[in-house]
Amino acid sequence: MAQVQYYGTGRRKSSVARVRLVPGEGRIVVNNREITEYIPFAALIEDVKQPLNITETANSYDVLVTVHGGGFSGQAGAIRHGISRALLEVDPEYRTSLKRAGLLTRDPRMKERKKYGLKGARRAPQFSKR
């Protein structure tokens, strides 16, 4: 018998996460490693679990994630976005609570490019009057 799976793709900064929800007991596996091994910050792990806590499905599904690009924060945001989208496939009723928490909106903030003549995106070289 084929197992039921729900898919969602999440993006944040330069990270892309492909998320699979499988009925299980609440494990989160990122790139074949437990989430506590993969992401070293408890605050980011809580961020990732937010959609599951809001919909009260934390112990109902195993989350299998493939994520690439970006750093810890961007990847955590991408995983959170992907889980939220996958939960919509599970039950469209979750849309209102997830939308209210702002979990279905792709965060558009990106790193601003460095401009020539400047030291960073906006930081100008030191100005000397004389």
Swiss-Prot record:
Signal peptide: none annotated. Keywords: Ribonucleoprotein, Ribosomal protein. It comes from the Bacteria. Residues 111-130 have a biased composition (Basic residues). Pfam families: Ribosomal_S9. GO terms for molecular function: RNA binding; structural constituent of ribosome. One of its GO terms (biological process) is translation. Residues 105-130 are annotated as: Disordered. GO terms for cellular component: cytosolic small ribosomal subunit. InterPro entries: Ribosomal_Su5_D2-typ_SF (IPR020568), Ribosomal_uS9 (IPR000754), Ribosomal_uS9_bac/plastid (IPR023035), Ribosomal_uS9_CS (IPR020574), Ribsml_uS5_D2-typ_fold_subgr (IPR014721). The keyword Hydrolase does not apply. Belongs to the universal ribosomal protein uS9 family. This is Small ribosomal subunit protein uS9. It comes from Bacillus pumilus (strain SAFR-032).
